[in-house]
């Protein structure tokens, strides 16, 4: 018989994505006295145990974290503001800006492209992005005419092969933009990761969740 991985009523499930968010969440978990006992980069498991038998971590795509939390498959999770802006916050409580995985969402164009003049002239721009909803709202507020092209891979390739005039993407150091002869021309929003909590879990598991949320809040405040 296959083992079941359904959580017990008293168990807490935390949804995390691999990479920077996972790495930067580890010190916050440790501040709550919780240590993840397996490395998702080397383990093939998608459900990881922790030093607290009542807490487990599920590894999901970054864009899926809000969905797992919203539907109660996870009690809480860590998601970037970029993901939350795209997915909406239905069924979620986001009490804490964790001040981790900081970056910015920006508009970038090929070096030499006069973006400001194109906007002034009312040009219709093709923009490649995976943040379609956020980009649409941003350009609508500025009165810029755009055709949005949804991509999932490397945005920087769009202008290089003539697919788009510009991109909307996350920028940390800007080194990837520079390596592809792109320049940042407009910041849309500062991004960091948020703790999101299932609203039902917040009521039904408050006694278990509260100490963890408090520890996260104290630890993240030190990062601000």
Curated annotation (Swiss-Prot):
> What are the alphabetically sorted keywords of the record?
Amino-acid biosynthesis, ATP-binding, Cytoplasm, Glycosyltransferase, Histidine biosynthesis, Nucleotide-binding, Transferase
Q: Which PANTHER family match?
A: ATP PHOSPHORIBOSYLTRANSFERASE (PTHR21403:SF8), ATP PHOSPHORIBOSYLTRANSFERASE ATP-PRTASE (PTHR21403)
State if Acyltransferase is listed as a keyword.
Answer: no
Query: What information about domains appears in the record's comments?
Result: Lacks the C-terminal regulatory region which is replaced by HisZ.
The UniProt entry's GO CC annotations, sorted and at most eight, read: cytoplasm
Checking HAMAP family in the record gives: HisG_Short (MF_01018)
Q: What Gene Ontology biological process does one annotation of this record name?
A: L-histidine biosynthetic process
**What is the name attached to this protein's record?**
ATP phosphoribosyltransferase
Keyword Methyltransferase, does the record have it? Answer: no
Tell me how this protein assembles.
Answer: Heteromultimer composed of HisG and HisZ subunits.
In the Enzyme Commission scheme, what number(s) does this protein have? 2.4.2.17
What chemistry does it catalyse, as a reaction equation? Answer: 1-(5-phospho-beta-D-ribosyl)-ATP + diphosphate = 5-phospho-alpha-D-ribose 1-diphosphate + ATP
Q: Where in the cell is it found?
A: Cytoplasm
